[in-house]
Amino acid sequence: ERFVGSPRHIEIQILADTHGNIVYLFERECSIQRRHQKVIEEAPSAVLTPELRKEMGEAAVGVAKSCNYVGAGTVEFLLDEKHNFYFLEMNTRLQVEHPVTEQITGIDLVREQINIARGEKLSFSQEDLKIQGHAFEVRVYAEDPKNNFLPDIGTLETYVRPQGLGVRVDDGFEEGMQIPIYYDPMIAKLVTFGKDREEARQRMLRAIDEYQISGVQTTLDFCKFTLKHDAFISGNFDTNFVKHHFKPEYLDESNEAEAEIAALLAAKLVEENTQTTASVTPSETRSKWKVNRMR
């Protein structure tokens, strides 16, 4: 087996019906990982050319055809620095990160999967599919990034979801509920969509800031750190991002910097308010009626 030293994790979404129709719904970039498990996904990838996208998509369709596959599935590949790709595995189900594909294609993958199970044909062809915009998903885990991403447990003392244009939250928790030790520590999937990668990224940063969770540690600060990192912004990253770019103390530095900025802004507002108040003379605060009465 070939050793790939700096791999990107790229997967292709496919749908196959019982009538022999198979399509690929483009790729998802899943290279931001910890413990070889995904934390941030996006679609489309920042590095795939249209030609490579088509080649990988057709390869994924070929995998599905080779085993007479029916339903929704994901064919996963490793992509090396020279853009050679290698088959990794096929997941015979909908992935956690399927919402980013729904966002850029406008296709409801859950509905299509149900229709396929009912024996219906796909409602679209490969030629009908187009990439529109860009989407990110961050997995909101009850984990402590400062402690090697160990799972955390406790009660969601505060749980307020972000809202707004291009923001989607898939979850199953409410304020006051318990995060137990018995299951996967994922709390939610936070998804943003924009007309391009930068707009989707900015919306994700805003959504993370607005997501209020207390009672357990979460991966939100780590995701924010990643989204603001130069390597991520440029698209120059691989599955070794955490190893090469992240240290737990960076989160403390980031929070301290934000607190300092907030304090400076607050001081500036107080100063401006004080100056405005001081500039108002007593005569300006009196009504004309009172002034006339005093003459």
Regions found by a protein language model. Give the residues of each.
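ATP-dependent carboxylate activation and anion-phosphoryl transfer catalytic cores
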Residues: 1-295
